[in-house]
Amino acid sequence: MNKLTFHNNKAMQDRRRVCIFLPNDKSVSIIINVKILCHQLLVQVCDLLRLKDSHLFGLSVIQNNEHVYMELSQKLYKYCPKEWKKEASKVRQYEVTWGIDQFGPPMIIHFRVQYYVENGKLISDRIARYYYYWHLRKQVLHSQCVLREEAYFLLAAFALQADLGNFKRKLHHGDYFEPEAYFPAWVVSKRGKDYILKHIPNMHKDQFALTASEAYLKYIKEAVRLDDVAIHYYRLYKDKREAEGSLTLGLTMRGIQIFQNLEEEKQLLYDFPWTNVGKLVFVGKKFEILPDGLPSARKLVYYTGCPTRSRHLLQLLSNSHRLYMNLQPVLRHLRKQEENEEKKQYRESYISDNLDLDMDPLEKRSRASGSSAGSVKHKRLSRHSTASHSSSHTSGIEADTKPRDPGPEDSCSGSAMHRKLKTCSSMTSHGSSHTSGVESGGKDRLEEDSQDEEIEMLVDDPRDLEPMPEESLEVSPEMCIYITEDMLLSRKLNGHSGLIVKEIGSSTSSSSETVVRLRGQSTDSLPQTICRKPKTSTDRHSLSLDDIRLYQKDFLRIAGLCQDTAQSYTFGCGHELDESGLYCNSCLAQQCVNIQDAFPVKRASKYFSLDLTHDEVPEFVV
């Protein structure tokens, strides 16, 4: 295409070049129309990357050393520099060696994580999990958790296993990796390269047989535990006259943090989990935080410096809060599955080791007495439950002294000498004083065992009894939760809390207020409800998020009373709950109501308010 054809073609003059920087230090260039929507650009980027699940990612531009995420409903030119919107004929011609031709200089856009999750199994797409892992890799390089130095060595071992595979002595020796690519600069400066290259290979060797997918999951789980990795930073001002922001707002997965900017570090001043934030108000440049349950005089007032930044922060905070609330039942379910898997692994190794120790002397004794090996094979091993209600037996692993033929009632017997034991007991005890074990018994013991198992089925999740396939080393798609756009833009998702946006006209001012109510207890009704106490516990306000899940049934009962009101929210779907108390997974993508524009474009003089309180649901509800 010659210059004459290009300058005479109006359609080509409206095209520009954008350069998309990816989390893995690579980039892609795209020629697009200058009036394209941000959503259309994101779709093109995902198509190039073959990424199917992009709901945790976003497009951002750097403004004043901050990542400003684009609203997907806006046009791209609202975020681009003024020079980028000029006609191509007026743009200075750059050298072709830089990849810039008659389309003008490229606009720099970053494809990065916008919403953090604490468990990699929530990311269903394999490629999305890969870029999420690389984003955390870059965040770890800037981490400053001095008291968690050992975590960086463990993360480096997971990353080496994911990048290089199993440790091989012939290949992985000497400087087979760059410490600067896996450790923060202060760790390399403190320990030195020689120290890292000496000790990391042993930690890399310990991750043998760990697949890349499993290494990604372990890296994600460990990296988000660092305080300054899964976080977004935004500058704040104490008053309007400040030239440089002396405060920093940190948006984490679980809430909001306020830091004091010192010379080379940030000092934490306030840490507000989402359960302790009552209301967020943006009035022009003013940013107000009202802690839940405190009078209005205790509110924190800061300034953003620009009304546009106020609106951007409001949307980012509200979407992060909504996603956090919607994912809590799913995370509780994943935690329970992981805990059950850990218990099964521990229980199986415990039984297997003791069986090997106890069967050897029995076998020697049988050989010494001249008994046949077949009689040993048919010895019954009965496993006693750890959740017996009245027994006081001690722990131990014993075999029956009398040989007996296998029958249909012998669920734990087999033809092999080392029989597989069915792990189907609960770890919770209802009055028993004994520990787990394997002991001898006859027909009466069989009846007691079956009775114990029936009682345990009322406590345990039946899905925990199903054996996991040993041959699958990759992460199963059933273990992943599909995060959809409805989790970010929905009124109700499986009954979980969503945003309700209202326009309230003010009689004393020409401005209007956008109120977003979610959950909790309104500070306006605090005097009337200050004496309201939960019936089951008197100290639930001090419980953590992990402890609150113990009261899930009470919450389902309370939240069900106000399900039909416009400002009430419940956890779980309308289908019948199984014995685990969770909702059906099919409702994650089906039972939701979309909001076309959760935060419509408004003038800078608008009064924005994000209210996280509620009048009918108690404060302890998560």
UniProtKB/Swiss-Prot annotation:
Q: What is this protein called?
A: FERM domain-containing protein 6
Give the UniProt subcellular location, in the record's own words: Cytoplasm; Cell membrane
Native source species: Mus musculus (Mouse)
Question: Is Cell membrane given among the entry's keywords?
Answer: yes
User: For the modification Phosphoserine, which residues carry it?
Assistant: S522, S525, S542, S544
Extent of Low complexity compositional bias? 384-395, 425-438
Region: Disordered, residue numbers: 357-452
Q: Which is one Pfam family of this protein?
A: FERM_C
**Membrane association type:** Peripheral membrane protein
Q: What is its main location?
A: cytoplasm
Q: Which UniProt keywords apply?
A: Cell membrane, Cytoplasm, Membrane, Phosphoprotein
CC per GO annotation: apical junction complex; cytoplasm; cytoskeleton; plasma membrane
FERM domain residues:
16-328
PTM sites of type Phosphothreonine: T523
> GO terms for biological process?
apical constriction; protein localization; regulation of actin filament-based process
Task: State the Gene3D superfamilies in the record.
Answer: 1.20.80.10, Phosphatidylinositol 3-kinase Catalytic Subunit, Chain A, domain 1, Pleckstrin-homology domain (PH domain)/Phosphotyrosine-binding domain (PTB)
Q: Encoded by which gene?
A: Frmd6
InterPro entries recorded: Band_41_domain, FERM/acyl-CoA-bd_prot_sf, FERM_2, FERM_central, FERM_domain, FERM_N, FERM_PH-like_C, FRMD6-FERM_C
